[in-house]
Amino acid sequence: MTISVGCRAPTVNEIINGVVTNALIQGDDTLRYSDPNLKPQAPGEIAPDAIANIKKSLQEALLSDEFLSEWLGRFVTDPYSDVDLKAYAETVAPGKVAATVKKAVALVRTEGSRFAFTRGKKGAIAFYVNGQREDLAGKAALLAQELANRMVVPAEIVQPYMSDKKCQGLVASLLSAGALVIEE
C-alpha cells in the first residue's frame, strides 16, 4: 500500500482537463491532421483507419512520458492557494547557506509547499517545487530527492551537500521562496 502525503490526488476529469489544457497551450497550431493513406470508403463513413489515425495522433500529442511527467510534476506540486509561502521566506545568500545549515537542527518544508521529482538519465532529475520545475544533476539531484522524500530533513543529512555550490544555491532558493524553513 502507498500512502501519499502532501500531494494532490486528482480526479480523472481534472487529469483530462489539465493534460488537454496543457497540450493546447504548448501545442503547435500549424500542424494539421492528414490521412493520405485512407482507403476508399462510402462517402458518409468514418472508417476504422481514420479513427486509428486520430487515436495515434492523440497518443503522440498527449501520452508521451515526457509530456505527462512534466504536467503531473507541476500539477501535484501546485501550492495550496490559501497559504502565503512568502510569509516564510528568508533570504540567505548561497555562500552563507552552509553556515546556516550547520547551526540548524533540520530543514522543514513549509505548510502548503509541495516537492516532487521525476528521474531522468544518468542520475539527473526534474525537481518540482510548488508548480515550478528545475533540472538537477549530481549532488544537487541527490539533495533534492532527500528534500522531496521528507517533510523534515535533519541538518546532518543536508550538511554533506553544503560543500557543493549548486546545493548551496538550491537550498538558498528554497529558503528565499518560503518553501523551506530552518529549524534551530
Located regions from the model:
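A conserved active-site cap/scaffold subdomain adjacent to cofactor or substrate pockets
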Residues: 1-69
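Active-site proximal loops enriched in glycine and acidic residues that flank catalytic Cys/His/Asp
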Residues: 5-7, 129, 162, 184
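Alpha-helix initiation and N-capping motif
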Residues: 9, 13, 140, 167-168
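Acidic, low-complexity/disordered tracts enriched in E/D and polar residues
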Residues: 63-148, 172, 183-184
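Short capping segments at the starts of secondary-structure elements
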Residues: 145-160
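Short amphipathic alpha-helical interaction segments
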Residues: 161-176
